[in-house]
């Protein structure tokens, strides 16, 4: 399997390979795996994610945690999709609920977009963006038996700054994923779904899914309003 990660592509930063995604969701969809077989973890490679967004300015870069919709949960990788596909890229400024914190050249916002729970880092400086992300990371609970907090992350670079969307998670999959009969919906949301484009792998689900179903699914996998408020408070206490 490791040969897949070394096949012909564009090398990036000496230890990634930029490949065309063989199962695209976007009109232009890339996969960026680590060349070495290492675990899917964001903490040591968030700076790499910023660098990738800085180089691929026509793309939004995304990270799915190992139990947050990752297509290869046991191998470190990012994905990238062309900008203009996910509604959140254009919509987020209209959904700002407030400022969590200012830090150096960066601001951390939170959005009024329930049932999603969304934090947005806006930064012209790489080090400051990393510091804010680390603060968010350490403000999130880690589930028993897991190595990192559950989250999905989107990063794009525009107007000489990074925009980072962090979606903290409470749950891997909604109840409908394992439900029996008509209640069954094979929805396991990842970054793209949280960015506003819901993917249904099975046609029957595409036909029957409703706005209420989507709200229910997001409400289950994202934080509760009370937990989201606690996270924002923890962040402010650390800065």
Which sequence ranges carry the predicted segments?
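Short, small-residue-biased leader/transition segments that mark boundaries at the very start
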Residues: 1-5
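Hydrophobic, conserved cores of late-appearing folded domains
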Residues: 6-26
């Amino acid at each position: 399997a490791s040969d897949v990660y070394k096949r012909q592509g564009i090398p990036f930063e000496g230890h990634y390979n930029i490949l065309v995604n063989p199962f695209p969701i976007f009109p232009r969809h890339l996969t960026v795996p680590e060349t070495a077989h290492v675990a899917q973890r964001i903490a040591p490679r968030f700076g790499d994610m910023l660098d990738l967004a800085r180089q691929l300015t026509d793309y939004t870069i995304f990270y799915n945690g190992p139990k947050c919709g990752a297509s290869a949960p046991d191998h470190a990788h990012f994905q990238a999709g062309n900008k203009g596909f996910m509604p959140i890229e254009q919509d987020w400024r209209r959904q700002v609920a407030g400022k969590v914190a200012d830090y150096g050249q960066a601001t951390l916002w939170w959005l009024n977009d329930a049932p999603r729970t969304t934090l947005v880092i806006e930064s012209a400086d790489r080090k400051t963006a990393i510091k804010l992300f680390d603060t968010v990371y350490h403000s999130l609970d880690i589930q028993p038996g897991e190595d990192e907090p559950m989250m999905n992350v989107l990063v794009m670079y525009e107007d000489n700054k990074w925009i980072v969307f962090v979606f903290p998670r409470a749950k891997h999959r909604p109840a409908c994923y394992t439900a029996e009969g008509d209640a069954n919906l094979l929805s396991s949301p990842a970054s793209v779904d949280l960015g506003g484009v819901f993917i249904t792998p099975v046609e029957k689900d595409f036909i029957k899914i409703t706005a209420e179903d989507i709200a229910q699914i997001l409400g289950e996998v994202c934080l509760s309003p009370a937990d989201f408020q606690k996270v924002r408070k923890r962040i402010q206490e650390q800065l």
